[in-house]
UniProtKB/Swiss-Prot annotation:
L-aspartate binds at T121, N125, D126. ATP binds at A10, Y11, S12, G13, G14, V15, D16, T17, S18, A38, G119. Keywords: Amino-acid biosynthesis, Arginine biosynthesis, ATP-binding, Cytoplasm, Ligase, Nucleotide-binding. It comes from Prochlorococcus marinus (strain SARG / CCMP1375 / SS120). The gene is argG. This is Argininosuccinate synthase. Belongs to the argininosuccinate synthase family. Type 1 subfamily.
Length: 402
């Protein structure tokens, strides 16, 4: 299928990427495979993953700690954008792909590899995200995609890998396909392919069930500066620690579970389960602090920008000119997004309790109040309403009686 002396493979340790190593060597004639795994805070023993790649036949196996750039450069922009694909999915998995792809391209250049490879199948979104990101960063770099070309079933893939000494990672007791990073978990396949079947509790790992969550509500306060969360309960934290703390707080109370039918890029509807407690909590609070610091017209415009931003990221266009332009709009709005939000966590719910901004609040009590301290000029409303309704009255005077 080609003559590639050296290839850098995006490696996860799963069935597909593990099978890619012997497949690339035997079917593509690749001489050297450098396996690259990204540490995105998934909490797995990545040394095991690294050694597994070597066992499968990789000449070199690398693990890079990308947690800090993942949160600072990808998660925080998503929070500022209130990014929810189809109004529900906070892009916890999608945000990781352009970062992995960019590091893949860097390694290919550093090691003078002739191509890069990934193990994404032809049915999923990740193939699109990887291919678009790689081609945007290195248009002439060859991308090898064996999982789109082989015709093996999942069981055949496992058997294929076992022939080369690769142990099967999926048992009958764990039929799910899972992706995990610091922002959350995505779970699909197995029994979840029946969209009417409730997910078993075993599906969830980082959020408590309603039954097991605390019986007492917990109120917390999250502080924002320029649209970024910077402190929880008065304690200033770095971006990675903010996510970890938010995950622990929201997850303990069972907040952040999502069960949805999702429209994939390739046109397939898919049943997806997500756990993203910290990210969902921070987005909810960020939306609230925006409500008091941004003007009505900016808020209305930003809602449309947010939807388009989430669509672009989901569809693989992280490095597109349009996404960059939307970033510029969002980042400008965030200069005024400063303040704190109080929120109560209890039995799977997160309920806003209050919000304040000392420096940028557009909520003015002297204007909003109905008390004796009201400073709003009520008489001015008459002239405003006359002009505001002028077009309607003109239309009615001409057409109403026809």
């Amino acid at each position: 299928m080609g003559d590639f002396q050296k290839v850098v493979l995006a490696y996860s340790g799963g069935v597909d990427t593990s099978a890619c190593i012997p497949y690339l060597k035997n079917e593509y004639g690749v001489e050297e495979i450098i396996a690259f795994a990204a540490d995105l805070g998934q909490g797995e023993e990545l040394e095991v993953v690294r050694k597994k790649a070597l066992l499968a036949g990789a000449k070199e196996s690398l693990v890079d700690d990308l947690i800090e750039p993942f949160i600072h450069d990808f998660a925080f922009p998503a929070i500022r954008a209130n990014a929810l694909y189809e109004g529900r999915y906070p892009l916890s998995t999608a945000l990781a792909r352009p970062l992995i792809a960019s590091r893949l391209v860097e390694l290919a250049r550093e090691m003078e590899a002739g191509a890069v490879a990934h193990g994404c199948t032809g049915k999923g979104n990740d193939q699109v995200r990887f291919d678009l990101a790689i081609s945007s960063l290195a248009p002439h770099l060859k991308i090898l995609t064996p999982a789109r070309e082989w015709s093996m079933s999942r069981q055949e893939l496992i058997s294929y890998g076992e022939k080369f000494g690769i142990p099967a990672p999926v048992s009958k007791k764990s039929p799910y396909s899972i992706d995990l990073n610091l922002l959350g978990r995505s779970i699909e396949a197995g029994p979840l392919e029946d969209p009417f079947l409730a997910p078993r509790e075993e599906v969830f790992q980082i959020t408590s069930s309603i039954q097991e969550s605390p019986d007492t509500p917990e109120e917390i306060e999250i502080q924002f500066e320029a649209g970024n969360p910077i402190a929880i309960n008065g304690v200033t934290l770095d971006p990675v620690s903010i996510i970890k703390k938010a995950n622990a707080l929201a997850g303990r109370h069972g907040f952040g579970r999502i069960d949805m039918i999702e429209n994939r890029v390739v046109g397939i509807k898919s049943r997806e389960i997500y756990e993203a407690p910290g990210l969902m909590l921070l987005i909810k609070c960020h939306q609230e602090i925006e409500s008091i610091t941004l003007s009505a017209d900016v808020l209305r415009t930003k809602v449309g920008i947010e939807r388009q931003w989430a669509d672009l990221v989901y569809q693989g266009f992280w490095f597109s000119p349009l996404k960059n332009a939307l970033d510029a709009f969002i980042d400008r709005t965030q200069l005024d997004v400063n303040g704190s939000v109080k929120i109560q966590l209890f039995k799977g719910n997160a309920t806003i309790q209050g919000r304040q901004s000392y420096s940028n609040s557009l909520y003015l009590p002297d204007i909003a109040t109905y008390s004796a301290e009201d400073q709003y000029d009520h008489k001015s409303a008459e002239g405003f309403i006359y002009v505001w309704g002028l077009a309607n009255r003109l239309w009615a005077s001409i057409n109403r009686d026809k």
